Amino acid sequence: MGKPDLSVEVAGIKLRNPVMTASGTFGYGKEFADYLDLEKIGAIITKGLSIRPKAGNPTPRIVETPGGMLNAIGLQNVGIDAFIQEKLPFLRTVNTPVIVNLYGNTLEEYGELAEKLDKLPEVAGLEVNISCPNVKQGGIVFGTDPNAAYEVVSLVRESTIKPLIVKLSPNVTNVVEMANACVDAGADALSLINTLTGMAIDLQKRRPILANMTGGLSGPAIKPVALRMVWQVAQAVKVPVIGIGGIMTATDALEFMLAGATAVQVGTANFLDPSAAQTIAEGMETYLEENGIADVKELIGALIT
């Protein structure tokens, strides 16, 4: 048997392997170029971009927790115009699909961002963040109400012909209802899960540790929740699902594929090991070789229940 085929396709975007980087954990790509080969991963997903630059939340805004971390960065970013002028030129030189994550505080901002990105051939697709739990206005509302989510996705769909991935929040009662609303509105793929809203308290000070009070929980602690939600959504929709949540190893990634994910995103692992995404992709290839599996796509949704 020759080398196994790790390629997958998500919303018309061809990936050399199923491993993408999760937004907010990989900067704009260049920051990690010294630590791994950007042409050995499936796709680069940028930090979440807004219309105007954003300073983010006051510190402290990160705290380690058992099995993960809480972050309340507050979607700090350079803004869409600076991204296009300063960050995109480097990404043009990399032969790996670039997917831009975007978020707005209003419906109109989502549409405006999509229109600006629609004209850029080097942007392979958009990932719409309707689910970030640490912003005091905007995202949380869109991400937890099916009608609001439908409105946002519909507007972005009208504003671009690019492949459209919608990132879902786990902070909902019925994730399948949210998934269906986004697909009905025109999503080409769904990525899940974003972080779970959490809190950490300092007993001595009797105060929250994070200046923002609450933050997003990520890392291995959320993996069982993520697997369950990916499995539920993958059975309910006809578009590709991208699994996110506590993926630290190739084993984790392959478990998400069995649950129904076509691709995965690596997030918190990038902070612990900046070469994690490449290491996970290589580990997946090794697993296929050792188990005589010719094509990684054989594993998608192959969970025996």
From Swiss-Prot:
Enzyme class label: oxidoreductase
Keyword Cell membrane: no
EC number: 1.3.1.14
Main subcellular location: cytoplasm
Reaction equation(s) it catalyzes: (S)-dihydroorotate + NAD(+) = orotate + NADH + H(+)
InterPro entries associated with the record: Aldolase_TIM, DHO_dehydrogenase, DHOD_1B, Dihydroorotate_DH_1, Dihydroorotate_DH_1_2, Dihydroorotate_DH_cat, Dihydroorotate_DH_CS, Dihydroorotate_DH_I
Subcellular location: Cytoplasm
GO molecular function, one term: dihydroorotate dehydrogenase (NAD+) activity
Pathway(s) it belongs to: Pyrimidine metabolism; UMP biosynthesis via de novo pathway; orotate from (S)-dihydroorotate (NAD(+) route): step 1/1
Alphabetical list of PANTHER family matching this protein: DIHYDROOROTATE DEHYDROGENASE (FUMARATE), DIHYDROOROTATE DEHYDROGENASE (QUINONE), MITOCHONDRIAL-RELATED
Quaternary assembly: Heterotetramer of 2 PyrK and 2 PyrD type B subunits.
Protein name, UniProt field: Dihydroorotate dehydrogenase B (NAD(+)), catalytic subunit
